[in-house]
Amino acid sequence: MNNQLIYTGKAKDIYSTKDENVIRTVYKDQATMLNGARKETIDGKGALNNQISSLIFEKLNMAGVVTHYIEQISKNEQLNKKVDIIPLEVVLRNVTAGSFSKRFGVEEGRVLETPIVEFYYKNDDLNDPFINDEHMKFLGIVNDEEIAYLKGETRRINELLKDWFAQIGLNLIDFKLEFGFDKDGKIILADEFSPDNCRLWDAEGNHMDKDVFRRDLGSLTDVYQVVLEKLIAL
């Protein structure tokens, strides 16, 4: 059915379209942390996230990464291919920061010799726990071949993103990706890529991402606007 709300999340709402294989994603003016324990309405955030993610996904598509992204249709809306989301958050870390630093008792800002890929089980009731390959297979989420693909594709995406952000004076510290199965059963990149789900530091070490909200460092939208303008100029 056309224009029916089929999913509501912390940052986005998903609607059906006339095409059963296409969805309309609406980005919200909402910032959350601690799995939604803290919520705040921030005017203009949805449009910034949508525009940033659209630019990144367009570049990924052109670079040969298969994604769910079709097109941006308004400041806060885009069309995407419908996928069955894999209940995993795939995190890649280039530099120590955030929960990684807390978990292992290391200072933030240490460059990792080899980027680290981590998986988290998408389950709000369980607070998205860390999960390894054996757990994923036990739960029937993905098999060995699919795990290898997720790791390899995430590392490939990282190399592209690191280069693009370096060109605009930003250091890609870490990020979270989500993938899904398309109508043909192929794993493709889904969700979004914005400062909501990555860490970006400028040359002076200033946070250019959602940590501005998490740590009360200033105006989130001002920072996101700077990131958007840099990406447009890329």
Swiss-Prot record:
Any GO BP annotation: 'de novo' IMP biosynthetic process
Family under the similarity heading: Belongs to the SAICAR synthetase family.
Top-rank lineage group of the source organism: Bacteria
Gene label: purC
Swiss-Prot/TrEMBL catalytic activity: 5-amino-1-(5-phospho-D-ribosyl)imidazole-4-carboxylate + L-aspartate + ATP = (2S)-2-[5-amino-1-(5-phospho-beta-D-ribosyl)imidazole-4-carboxamido]succinate + ADP + phosphate + 2 H(+)
Name under which the protein is recorded: Phosphoribosylaminoimidazole-succinocarboxamide synthase
Enzyme Commission number(s): 6.3.2.6
The keyword ATP-binding is assigned to this record: yes
Gene3D superfamilies (UniProt xref): ATP-grasp fold, B domain, Phosphorylase Kinase, domain 1
InterPro entries: SAICAR_synt/ADE2_N, SAICAR_synt_PurC, SAICAR_synth, SAICAR_synthetase, SAICAR_synthetase_CS
Keywords per UniProt: ATP-binding, Ligase, Nucleotide-binding, Purine biosynthesis
GO molecular function: ATP binding; phosphoribosylaminoimidazolesuccinocarboxamide synthase activity
Main enzyme class: ligase
Pathway: Purine metabolism; IMP biosynthesis via de novo pathway; 5-amino-1-(5-phospho-D-ribosyl)imidazole-4-carboxamide from 5-amino-1-(5-phospho-D-ribosyl)imidazole-4-carboxylate: step 1/2
Signal peptide range in chain numbering: none
Organism: Streptococcus agalactiae serotype III (strain NEM316)
